Amino acid sequence: MKGYQPETYGERIADVYDELFADVSDVAANVSFLDALAPRRPGRFLELAVGTGRLAIPLAALGHDVTGIDVSASMLAALSAADTDRRVTTVHGDMVDVLPAGPFDVVFVAFNSLFMLADADRQRACFAAVATVLAPGGSFVVEAFVPWDPPRGGPHVELRSMTTDRVVLAADLTDSVNQTVNGQFIELVDGQPVRLRPYVLRWSRPAELDAWAAATGLRLGERFADVRRAPFTDDSPFHVSVYRGA
């Protein structure tokens, strides 16, 4: 998408992110899943693409040492506003090139955020970067959707929300060959200019992630269909993969 930069998504969506994705997952279940991975208390956690702190803040409230990194200053500002007790340490930067010093007991990237890295090379590099800051025997958790099979192609539009004076649409164009989606959240509010919130993602199949992990010395420890540890099957639309450090 012309003009799109790594920080574009967060900068354009931070003000409505929590509203748009309020029901995307069970926060309590996510936090419980992550909490159980800590080998000690408090554990040391790093969240990649921490966003508004949806998971980082309640995880830190359990007493863990939590650091979150995000390329969007606006996302981190929203996190700071919500983190009234200042429990989460934040880092402004890319989740490949500027990871804070480890070792971390658990590194995690939730809600498809790994796919916000523009291409396979950047996603592969993310695994390599995580391997350098993960404690021996630590966990790297990737939560993401399982790509469509067969891949969905072409344009797609769906209604996200509607009130008497506001409509939010999601429009995207999928390239099944390059495994990319270019899209916009389109906000129409009566009497106001149209707001566009663009996003670009490159999806990866679980087998690709497993290969990148193995190449960096990580191994797949467990894979579930969700954070409640439902069994992962060929029909699962999502996966929660736990990679272990050497």
Please tell me what each predicted stretch does.
Residues 1-51:
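Conserved class I S-adenosyl-L-methionine
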Residues 53-97:
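Class I SAM-dependent methyltransferase SAM/SAH-binding core
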Residues 99-106:
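A short acidic, Gly/Pro-enriched loop at the edge of an enzyme's catalytic core
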Residues 110-112:
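Residues lining the SAM
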Residues 124-136:
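A short glycine-rich, Lys/Arg-flanked "PGG" loop and its adjoining helix->strand segment in the class I
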Residues 141-211:
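SAM-dependent methyltransferase
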Residues 206-246:
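C-terminal lobe and adjacent flexible extensions of AdoMet/dcAdoMet transferase-like proteins
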